[in-house]
Regions:
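Periplasmic c-type cytochrome electron-transfer domains
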Residues: 21-344
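Positively charged n-region of N-terminal signal peptides that target proteins for export
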Residues: 1-5
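Bacterial N-terminal signal peptides
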Residues: 7-17
Length: 344
């Protein structure tokens, strides 16, 4: 009798262990990608090299799977955002940001070149790192509906060479999709490649942008139009709550009120502006930089101007010229490309 009970117990343990191995995020197992199709992105030569992890190479099948997951409400099943997909908020026509008033959401564009994510840099590393946070902590993805779906098991097998569907697998597929979200075909790019020319006003605006007159280029560096760093740009002189920015992560006084530099690519489409969405138009943003910067002990030194303090003092015409240039950063192809839209 005891032998039978012991045998049954051992069998149960083996069964539970097998199920755990099957369903856990088995990151140590190397997937079979021999049947996938490598995908090389068409990125201009003046862009930095893409950092693509060896264990999550870009493939046609992986990007297609990530795209489908991005647009599928099944991803939020049983989670805090039940019934919503990533794309329910991140609108392609708005450069994959969230339209509306209130807190601004950084757009899902050119994140393949980023190593710090979210306004305060709460997550650092690769796209896999930020999407692991999104999958596990934000969406709290339940993978059972994906495992029981009539199509997803085959899609995961084709894309990732795995017979399991885990949160780790979902993360990898989404990371490939996010690397596909590259905006590199604006008028600014066409001018840089000799395929177009600026109007006189756009050229004047570019001169302001890339000189000390506008002082934009120090943080919004070309070609990504962001340095992917953190700066206190003088939105306010006292800080509390979310407004402490990077300080909440590092505890360093120099980071008080500092937030990640957003890319200016497609900036004309991504209102409202600043981390808290306080500005509704580019005109308001330029007015702030021209004469509304507030001093604080952690104000970034790049915000000070010799002889003029913390104001740019742009004329109305200079402001208009600068805004004209900012509009050349709009990539109409990116925001209208059917290949980036819903697959459903």
């Amino acid at each position: 009798m005891r032998a039978s009970v012991a045998a049954a117990f051992i069998t149960l343990v083996m069964l539970v262990t097998t199920m755990a191995c099957r369903h856990d995020d088995l990151e140590g197992i190397q997937p079979d990608l021999s049947r996938t199709t490598p995908l090389e992105l068409d990125v201009p030569s003046y862009f930095p090299p893409l950092n693509i992890p060896a264990d999550d190479p870009l493939t046609v099948e992986g990007v297609a799977l990530g795209r489908r997951l991005y647009y599928d409400t099944l991803l939020s099943h049983n989670g805090p955002f039940q019934g919503r997909a990533c794309a329910s908020c991140h609108d392609q026509s708005r450069s994959f940001t969230v339209p509306g008033n209130g807190t601004n959401v950084l757009p899902h564009v050119n994140l393949a070149w980023s190593t710090n994510f979210l306004w305060n840099g709460k997550v650092s590393g690769t796209l896999e790192d930020i999407l692991r946070f999104e999958v596990e902590d934000f969406f709290q993805v339940d993978v059972e509906p994906l495992r029981n779906h009539p199509e997803y098991p085959a899609l995961f097998r084709q894309a990732l060479g795995t017979n399991t569907i885990t949160r780790h697998d979902v993360t990898r597929a989404l990371a490939q999709w996010f690397r596909r979200l590259t905006s590199t075909r604006s008028k600014f790019d066409q001018v840089k490649m000799g395929q177009a020319v600026f109007t006189v006003q756009e050229q004047l605006g570019a001169m302001i942008f890339f000189s000390e007159a506008g002082d934009c280029f120090h943080c919004h560096t070309s070609p990504l139009m962001t340095d992917n760093a953190f700066h206190n740009i003088g939105l306010q002189s006292a800080f509390s709550g979310y407004d402490v920015g990077r300080y909440a992560i590092t505890g360093a006084p120099m980071h008080m009120g500092a937030f990640k530099t957003p890319t200016l690519r497609n900036i004309a489409l991504t209102a409202p502006y600043m981390h808290d969405g306080r500005f509704q138009s580019l005109e308001e943003v330029i007015d702030f930089y021209s004469g509304g910067v507030q001093h604080s002990p952690s104000l970034d030194p790049i915000m000070t101007k010799p002889g003029t303090g913390i104001t740019l003092g742009l004329t109305s015409q200079q402001k208009a010229d600068l805004i004209a240039f900012l509009h050349t950063l709009t990539d109409e192809t990116f925001v209208t490309d059917p290949a980036l839209g819903s697959p459903f």
